[in-house]
């Protein structure tokens, strides 16, 4: 036992490496929608890229030193048989077996009431006996994984670390009633325990014989509330890991206009989309959020914009809970899963086959440049008056606040309790959602629109939530778009398919789509005359002479041009190419 305890502590001193050499090795073909469990067959749900194995410690080691890996074997076999991917995790902490308390691990009772009936108490993680048995568990876990043939190990995309209570990485739910056992999430003692556990996983799964397996971490950097308390953990990872790793970061795919989402974009996206040096992957889950009041206002719409929001932030894996998977076909939101799959693995512009730009504007009350304090009031997350003034500025375009109380909520409480759509918020994403296709001077050439066609109801089309349009009265009669500079490399003619979703709002209204064909003047792909159906339509065109090297007006590759004095509305523009 002394040897294992020494090992647990000493592992934190593994050699250091340069962060620029760390590149996640999860195959891009694994990026997409996953089964949060392992009960679904990809034949029935063809959008599934992978499944998960998550077992409580108590089920794996019912008696001290006797390990039952039969459920793990079945999960690996299923992934191998279906040619799908798998990620692994073990629930520790309150999911430990009862016998550890007979081996000298103190029970810790907390003041938590929300999880009563699920967890009555927790182990004291710093107890020598707990460290001993935890280390043995992870060591045996790794030994068993390494016993699989290489072709089966290759189906394991990554392993999620859980050092505390669930994957949220806290020692307890609530505070310990006995102050001797208190372990706040940011306390030095808990941080030391976590870093020792990190080192144990690195040694077990990324060093020694066998294929190194990527690891997934949570609470290792800033979060949606701008909390930077985990920078020491981040520093440890980027100086000690040689192999790839990912982050668990759940806000973006669970909604849109969530407090603090802009901070998550700014912190992580550079490591996820077109990364330079350090390359990560990002997992998020859809838990029971989809059954909460806000999501239920319009389930297909909520899933769609959650997918778009997540893709804009570089999410790689979207782990969907059982109830949502079962309902997806019946309620018509599985199309969002296919959309997510289409773009999740498109992280390098040189090799991407597709690009999109979903037109949107979020009114970020934290932005004092866009919304000066002398006009709208002091910038503060508690200043609801400022948020309402900003919204009023755009009310003529459909901007609105349905739930004032939610403006003061954190993003977790938003997902749980929000009861309406808000077009303003604190640190929300302000611009279009996109992947390698960008609108040029969006606010100077178009107007943002919200709730197109009227209030959002359960039957509103998914595109009704956000859009952009012409405004002839203010001279905004053309919208310009450009692809990433490295999406195309030469000036040769190429075969390109364009897909556009637009709103047919006015009979007789005319507009056209132009593209860069390498000529001095942009070429017309198609023209449209509206019928005034008040419905969303889509149009797809395949071009054989597209150059798209920013040779159009304002350096654009594609343009939407108004050809009369009536205003037109658009939702999403997509570009597809076939690679040689």
Q: Model-derived features: where do they sit?
A:
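Substrate-binding cleft of secreted/luminal carbohydrate-active enzymes
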Residues: 91, 243-423
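Substrate-binding cleft/loops of secretory-pathway carbohydrate-active enzymes
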Residues: 160, 165-171, 182, 186, ...
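Glycan-recognition and processing domains
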Residues: 376-487, 576
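Short, surface-exposed beta-strand/strand-loop-strand elements in extracellular ectodomains
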Residues: 508-521
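Extracellular carbohydrate recognition and processing domains
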Residues: 520-552
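Short beta-strand-plus-loop segments that form exposed binding edges in beta-rich domains
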Residues: 558-566
